[in-house]
């Protein structure tokens, strides 16, 4: 009888999970600053993505800038919808099936317990998507998975977070004093 080895756990992803658990559990000390490096964030994304999007989403990668981020992944939108239990009509299914490289560029602004994520640019299979087509994709694919998501509009940060800074080196989460 062969023994099954437990799947390897990435300690960098575990580090992010521990930090988020402290913040979300209300155990963060007033004035604390939590640093999540770019390497940790990418490790966490690789572990977390299959839990959040079980089908049709592979090879996530995040490149951070000064209050910006580029996200990359291979996405099969039809499989993503199927995995979320969303029905797709035949015509739309034929248009969206198949895995495509996707790049999303966003700008991040945060202060006084609030934040806004501004979607700057989306590329699907090398084609830039914008305007009403981008709005359609957000309504059809993103919002059904995350109905409470806010894009291009401010939202309250949770768990006593004052603000979040994004730099090429990583993300700093500041807890209110």
Predicted segments with their positions:
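Extracellular/lumenal and peripheral-membrane lipid-interaction modules
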Residues: 3-177
């Amino acid at each position: 009888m062969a023994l099954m080895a437990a799947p390897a756990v990435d300690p960098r992803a575990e580090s992010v999970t521990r930090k988020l658990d402290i913040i979300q559990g209300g155990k963060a000390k007033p004035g604390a600053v939590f640093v999540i490096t770019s390497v940790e964030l990418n490790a966490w994304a690789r572990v977390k993505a299959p839990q959040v999007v079980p089908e049709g989403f592979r090879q996530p990668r995040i490149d951070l800038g000064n209050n910006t981020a580029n996200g990359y992944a291979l996405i099969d939108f039809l499989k993503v919808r199927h995995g979320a239990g969303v029905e797709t009509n035949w015509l739309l299914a034929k248009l969206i099936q198949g895995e495509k490289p996707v790049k999303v560029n966003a700008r991040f602004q945060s202060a006084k317990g609030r934040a806004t994520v501004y979607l700057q640019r989306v590329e699907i299979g090398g084609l830039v998507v914008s305007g009403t087509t981008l709005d359609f994709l957000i309504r059809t694919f993103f919002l059904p998975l995350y109905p409470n998501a806010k894009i291009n509009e401010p939202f309250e940060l949770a768990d006593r977070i004052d603000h979040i800074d994004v730099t090429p080196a990583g993300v700093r989460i500041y807890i209110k004093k």
